[in-house]
Design a protein with these regions (language model features):
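Extreme N-terminal starter segment of soluble prokaryotic enzymes
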Residues: 1-5
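SAM-dependent methyltransferase catalytic region
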Residues: 6, 10, 225-227
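A conditional alpha-helix N-cap/helix-loop micro-motif detector
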Residues: 7, 58-62, 146
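Conserved SAM/SAH-binding loop
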Residues: 8-12, 219-220
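Short, well-ordered alpha-helical scaffold segments within catalytic/effector domains
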Residues: 11, 62-66, 150-154
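Class I S-adenosyl-L-methionine
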Residues: 17-27, 31, 35-50, 70-227
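A short acidic, glycine-rich active-site loop
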Residues: 49-63
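A short glycine-rich, Lys/Arg-flanked "PGG" loop and its adjoining helix->strand segment in the class I
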Residues: 59-75
Length: 227
């Protein structure tokens, strides 16, 4: 089993690949809505870059990105697909992440997130609460303002991947997809252009999957058991 993460532009990487290099790609591209400090429920913490530095969400990817993703992948899941309908074919297999866990919600946050797919299955709903600071995954290490929980990717892999599949995430961000793939035994390739998120996601992966803890003096301590 391999798990590779590259600090590179995903479009350049995909252009270097032959057709259908991956069995399943799961992408979480920028929605083009930006994230302003104090308006997204994510305060500032030592584990994340300041939101003042967030520029990656100012615009959505070009059509070329989606064309390349579909070329190098057999099956594709794209979070925020409702923002890209003018760039993607019509889909009958949407995935819904119910972030309220089926309960009534009056917050400023969206009740759900939608994922477009190129598959022919029926619409499915995944329920896991994550509304700002109210979250069923509050103990998970947070390093990214739009971080999706590892449990979500575990569910996606259980339902849309099969044994032996090769998984790709073109914009790995927090690394949740990589962690889920590793723990479930899938070969994984990811790209992350931002150097800070790239390094933080490696640190998170090493902690959650390899039991490594980076000490203040820069040394690495390895846990004998994981939690």
């Amino acid at each position: 089993m391999t798990s590779d993460l590259f600090n590179t532009d995903c479009l350049d990487y995909m252009k270097s690949l032959p057709d259908k290099s991956f069995d399943l790609s799961i992408a979480d591209p920028p929605f083009g809505v930006s994230y302003a400090r104090g308006k997204n429920g994510w305060g500032v913490c030592d584990n994340r870059p300041s939101l003042d530095d967030v520029k990656w969400d100012s615009k959505i990817p070009d059509k070329e990105f989606f064309d390349e993703l579909l070329r190098v992948s057999e099956s594709v899941i794209i979070w925020g697909g409702n923002y890209y309908t003018h760039l993607l074919p019509v889909s009958k297999c949407w995935i819904v992440w119910d972030k309220c866990d089926g309960t009534t919600n009056k917050s400023v946050f969206a009740d759900a997130e939608l994922a477009w797919t190129n598959m022919t299955k029926v619409v499915r709903i995944f329920r896991l609460r994550q509304m700002g600071f109210i979250s069923d995954t509050k103990d998970e290490m947070r390093i990214h303002p739009t971080q999706k929980p590892t449990e979500l990717y575990v569910w996606l892999l259980k339902n849309y991947a099969k044994e032996g599949d090769r998984i790709f995430d073109p914009m790995t961000g927090s690394g949740s997809s990589r962690i889920a793939a590793y723990k479930m035994g899938f070969d994984f390739v990811g790209c992350e252009l931002d150097k800070t998120y790239y390094e933080k996601s490696i640190e998170r992966f090493n902690l959650e999957c390899l039991g490594e803890i980076k000490l203040k003096d820069g040394l690495i301590a390895k846990q004998l058991t994981l939690f």
